[in-house]
Swiss-Prot record:
The keyword Oxidoreductase does not apply. Its EC number is 6.1.1.17. Monomer. It comes from Prochlorococcus marinus (strain NATL2A). This is Glutamate--tRNA ligase. A motif ('KMSKS' region) lies at residues 248-252. It is found in: Cytoplasm. It catalyses: tRNA(Glu) + L-glutamate + ATP = L-glutamyl-tRNA(Glu) + AMP + diphosphate. One of its GO terms (biological process) is glutamyl-tRNA aminoacylation. GO terms for cellular component: cytosol. Catalyzes the attachment of glutamate to tRNA(Glu) in a two-step reaction: glutamate is first activated by ATP to form Glu-AMP and then transferred to the acceptor end of tRNA(Glu). ATP binds at K251.
Length: 476
């Protein structure tokens, strides 16, 4: 069987983490099997679909390194084909027009609830006589079109993740609406389960890989495949992604879209790495820190768990820090320089920028951390409480005055690590204080705090702007 898989997002919002994980599993499976990964935009919800969301989906997938093999299919462009299929189902007796009003359906559901029953359509208009149908039309009622589902029907399939699955027709909510309300002489807008079957068949999809929240849809869609005498694809239902409280991850949890993760400073490599781990168990001997192109060679649904995956921020942050620490200084600077420019910061030289990222990179977890850590090199900082206390020590002013006098006789462009160390040693000896006092006082004066990366390297970088002199002089 030639493997053809697809991602079918709805452009009613930005690319969600769960959708991106589904895309990743489809892409990995296609690569492993030498197959084809396709993209279908399910834009039949005209009111909520937006062009900017389509672009966000494209951008998010490409940022993650997930590229599709053929031009994207736009579902709304096939509406005539969908309606023709619905007409065929009606003509063959698999579907019918239902004239029940929304008020009648609401009353039906309320009655079922009062009687302790699960709400479901009671198939009341499945067998209308021509006379009854004529009366509904005369009264001005517009029908939906429903697909017949027998309560006695058992639907089974072998799921690549969950094994043998069986659903009963009585658990599917009654006869299924496949077209929205429209005048009786027309067909309304086709609905999800019908158009998915039509498009997956037209695209020759061999495997449908999606979340476990689609299990009931799969049972309904298999009935449609059978009624239309179409080849039924292989199904695989991936585990849900849960939040820290064990509930399905949603917008209420804050960051859920790929574009938001990108803005926060997560790397595409770490995101793809982590999303693969949300439901897929790493085979023995394989490190959890990997590139998805490597995993595509070993990916298997046998290693995808049935149990839901819990989103772990600590794990994602660890992976992101690993990716950053593995970056060359050149690559890290490429990521940071646009952010520096957004803040109005300009590098005195490329070499200076390389030295800066080499200094701050080891402590970065997010790309955006580099902005916070680089800020003291571009902008003078307010004194922290510990910085104030340090500079209140009476010897601090003497130390800083000594260092400033020596700096005035030093060329900023040639100031080096060796000269900085020599100057600290001179201050220690001349001011008759401990070296630690000199270094703490100097750090407080230069950067406003007692914490930060290596002081000597930081000082050398700051001296390229001659800002060390200005910052020390204002405190004396």
């Amino acid at each position: 069987m030639k493997v053809r898989v697809r991602l079918a997002p709805s452009p009613t919002g930005t690319l969600h983490l769960g959708t991106a994980r589904t895309a990743l599993f489809n892409w990995l499976f296609a690569k492993k099997e030498g197959g084809t990964f396709l993209l279908r935009i399910e834009d039949t919800d005209i009111e909520r679909s937006r062009e900017e969301y389509i672009n966000d989906i494209y951008d998010g997938l490409q940022w993650l390194g997930i590229n599709w093999d053929e031009s994207p299919t736009i579902q709304s462009e096939r509406v005539n084909e969908h309606k023709q299929i619905i007409k065929t189902l009606v003509d063959k007796g698999f579907a019918y027009k239902c004239y029940a009003s929304e008020a009648e359906l609401d009353e039906m559901r309320e009655t079922q609830k009062r009687n302790g029953l699960a709400p479901k359509y009671d198939n009341r208009h499945r067998n209308l006589t021509p006379e009854q149908e004529s009366e509904f039309i005369k009264s001005g009622r517009d029908p939906v079109i429903r697909f017949k589902i027998s309560d006695e029907k058992l639907i089974s399939w072998n799921d690549l993740i969950r094994g043998k699955m069986t659903w009963s027709g009585k658990d599917l909510g009654g006869d299924m609406v496949i077209a929205r309300r429209a005048p009786a002489n027309s067909i309304g807008d086709p609905l999800y389960n019908l158009v998915v079957v039509a498009d997956d068949s037209a695209m020759k999809i061999s495997h449908v890989i999606r979340g476990e929240d689609h299990l009931a849809n799969t049972a309904k869609q298999i009935l449609l495949y059978e009624a239309l005498d179409l080849n039924i694809p292989v199904f695989a239902h991936t585990p849900l992604i849960l939040n820290s409280e064990g509930k399905k991850l949603s917008k209420r949890d804050g960051v859920t879209s790929i574009s938001e993760f990108k803005k926060m400073g997560y790397t595409s490599e770490a995101m793809a790495n982590y999303m693969t781990l949300l439901g897929w168990s790493v085979p023995e001997g394989i490190n959890e820190r990997f590139n998805i192109s490597e995993v595509s060679e070993i990916f298997s649904f046998k290693k995808v768990n049935k149990a839901s995956a819990k989103f772990d921020w600590d794990k994602l942050n660890w992976l992101n820090s690993q990716v950053i620490h593995e970056m060359s200084a050149e690559t890290l600077l490429e990521n940071l320089e646009p952010l520096f420019k957004e803040n109005g910061w300009h590098l005195p030289s490329h070499e200076w920028g390389i030295n800066l990222v080499g200094l701050i990179g080891p402590s970065m977890v997010l790309i955006n951390d580099g902005v916070d850590q680089a800020k003291p090199f571009f902008e003078e900082q307010e004194l922290s409480e510990d910085g104030k206390k340090q500079l209140e020590i009476k010897e601090a002013a003497v130390i800083l005055k000594f260092i400033l006098e020596k700096l005035e006789d030093t060329d900023a462009a040639s100031f080096s690590k060796e000269k900085a160390l020599d100057l600290i040693n001179q201050a220690t000896k001349s001011c008759e204080v401990k070296k630690g006092l000199v270094m703490k006082s100097l750090r407080a004066a230069l950067f406003g705090t007692l914490n930060g990366p290596d002081l000597i390297q930081s000082w050398v970088l700051l001296s390229r702007f001659s800002k060390d002199r200005a910052r020390i002089s204002r405190l004396i």
